[in-house]
Structures are given as structure tokens and as C-alpha cells.
Amino acid sequence: MSWLQVIVLAVVQGLTEFLPVSSSGHLAIVSRVFFDDDAGASFTAVTQLGTEVAVLVYFARDIGRIATAWFRGLRNPGRRDADYRLGWYVIIGTIPIGVIGLLLKDEIRTAARNLWAIAIALIVFSAVIAAAEYFGRQVRHVEQLTWRDGVIVGVAQCLALLPGVSRSGATISAGLFLGLDRELAARFGFLLAIPAVFASGLFSLPDAFAPVGEGMSATGPQLLVATVIAFVVGFAAVAWFLRFLVRHGMYWFVGYRVVLGVVVLILLSTGVVAAI
């Protein structure tokens, strides 16, 4: 992997990780179209560590408050507030993707990264996002979250294992279908992603240095630089996206996903780019 590839893919990762457009799908598309190869699932997982650190920094106060409330609630049942419960919902919501991710790790690294599958997922899941925006009542706030919300949004997060779906798109859509307001749906989804993405990144770290049969390999310094770039770009992206989401919703991204999916299908149909 050249340094140009590293920089371009890191910027793509940072820009798209928090948008409902699928960062893993974009990395696969950009890699194939411009560099005639796939960055690989391991490179994707490791660079996601940079964007998740960006989430940690951006939501540091929220995370600190939730963690404090959770430990306080364990010691003193009389002080179990909404933040204490939110801590449990994040834990509960992380379980599904942990189990499914381990069971399907081989498929995620290979078959699911086919550009035909990614293009179709981009288009099909656009309908889900649009439906969530249209039917979501957005009347529930953090005090009204329940363990059921944690389970459902956690299960929805499993869809992010398929490139082309989008983690934020899946979790925010699930939250909207459950009646959560847009900002809560986004914040809860981002918090839910932190343990899952960190576990995935650390698990994939050894493979990222020498992926066999799954794409371009990156050196240690390249992975470090890519992760730092993804952090910087990702921090700016999450700050912008939350403001944009509250004001405008996700319809703009629905249109973008459909256009991108159609373009990729055309490139595949005409033989301009290979599916795998």
C-alpha cells in the first residue's frame, strides 16, 4: 500500500464513519475504483480506532457522566438515574454485534465485500433510512429509554457488519423507528458503537499488518498515520453531522446513497471495475 493510498483511505474513513453512508463500503469502492484493490476488512477495522477515539473525545463529558452514574448506581441502588440505565443499555446493546461479529467474521472479510453486494446494500438500505425519517415520531427522550431500546438498536447495529449498510444509518434508523428524537438516536448509536469498534479494531490489529488474500497490506507507520488522520477528520465530521442531523435529517444522505449505488452498478455492469 502506497502512502497516497493510506492518506486517501484514511480521509475517506474519517469523513464517512459517522455519516449514514457506510465507511466500509466507501473504503471498498474507493480502493477498487482508484487503486484497483481492496483495502481489506482489517485495515478498515484498525483505522476505525481513530474515528472511535474521536467519538471518545467528542463525547468525553457524556461518557464520564454515564460511567460515574453507572458505578455509583452499582454501589447505591437509591441513586440509579437515567445515566445509570443508559450505561446498562450500552452494555446490553453491544452483545448482539459481538456474538454475530465473531460467528460471521470470515464472511465479513470476504463475500460481504463484493461490490455488487455493497452497491445493492447502499440502494436498498436507503429505503429503510427514508422510512425511519418519515415514520419516526421523535417524541421520546433519554429519560424514556428502556432495555428494549438497547436490544433493538444493538441488533440493528449488527447490520453494520455488511459493507454498504452503515452503522450510524442502522442505529439512527432503529432509534427513529422507536420514537427517539434525532439527536438522542444519533448519540445513543455512537455510544453503542464505541465498545464494538474498539474490540473489532484490536482484534484485527495483527491481521492488518499482513492480510492474506483480503487486500492491500499496510506497514506499522502507515497504520499509525492512517489512524491519526481518521481521528482528526472524524472529529470534525461527527461535530458537523450532529448539527446537520438535528436541522435537516438524513434525506440528503438517502439521495447520495442511491446515486452512488447506481454509479457503482453501472461501473460493474460495464466492466470498468471488478466486483472482487
From Swiss-Prot:
Organism listed in the record: Mycobacterium sp. (strain KMS)
Residues annotated as transmembrane: 1-21, 39-59, 84-104, 115-135, 159-179, 190-210, 222-242, 253-273
Record keywords, A-Z: Antibiotic resistance, Cell membrane, Cell shape, Cell wall biogenesis/degradation, Hydrolase, Membrane, Peptidoglycan synthesis, Transmembrane, Transmembrane helix
Membrane topology: Multi-pass membrane protein
EC annotation from Swiss-Prot or TrEMBL: 3.6.1.27
Name by which UniProt lists this protein: Undecaprenyl-diphosphatase
Gene: uppP
Coiled coil: none
Reactions this protein catalyses: di-trans,octa-cis-undecaprenyl diphosphate + H2O = di-trans,octa-cis-undecaprenyl phosphate + phosphate + H(+)
Main location: membrane
GO cellular component, one term: plasma membrane
Pfam families attached to this UniProt entry: BacA
Family: Belongs to the UppP family.
